[in-house]
Amino acid sequence: MTIDYLHPQEEFLRTLDIKTLLPQQPPFVMVGKLTFFDARKIITETLVSAENIFTNAGTFSASGLIENIAQTCAVRIGYVNQYVLQRGIQIGFIGAIRNLDIYRLPKVGERITTIVEVMEEVFGMTLAKAQVVCDEEVLITAEMKIAVKEEERK
């Protein structure tokens, strides 16, 4: 059975170790699992834990939510590189954050879903629109510009 990596089935995504798609490693991993991928959209889920370095007094911080969005973008880049282009992981950097609106910070034990949609990609830059939701309640929305280094992580 061949896998269509551009339109992967849920059962394939469930088998992925998300850490293999990221340049970040524990304890700085802010995403839990990849639940959806296509050429323009990616969705991750994360359980907010008390052990997370961005959790304080039972609440996941705004910085943690922003990093969660950035790492969801990184998972997309890692997935494309590893499964579509068959190359190594590249390191990305947040170039800009615009239209950031934070409505509520999630609590320990809540499961957040991060949805990133690519608006434009050109010259190693990706402009993406993102939102993080918890039980269909929007927690944060933002636009993020990500720059990707051409060289692969060693």
Q: Positions of the model-derived regions?
A:
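N-terminal leader/capping segments at the start of a protein or of a new domain
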Residues: 1-40
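HotDog/MaoC-like acyl-thioester-processing domains
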Residues: 2-8, 43, 75, 107-113, ...
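Hydrophobic beta-strand-centered segment that forms part of the acyl-chain substrate-binding groove
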Residues: 11, 75-113
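Catalytic strand-loop segment that frames the active site of acyl-thioester-processing enzymes
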Residues: 25-61
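Small-residue-enriched segments and motifs
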Residues: 29-32, 92-95, 114-116, 142
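Conserved positions in beta-strands of structured domains
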Residues: 32-35, 98, 103, 117-119
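A conserved, well-ordered hydrophobic junction motif at loop->secondary-structure transitions
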Residues: 47-81
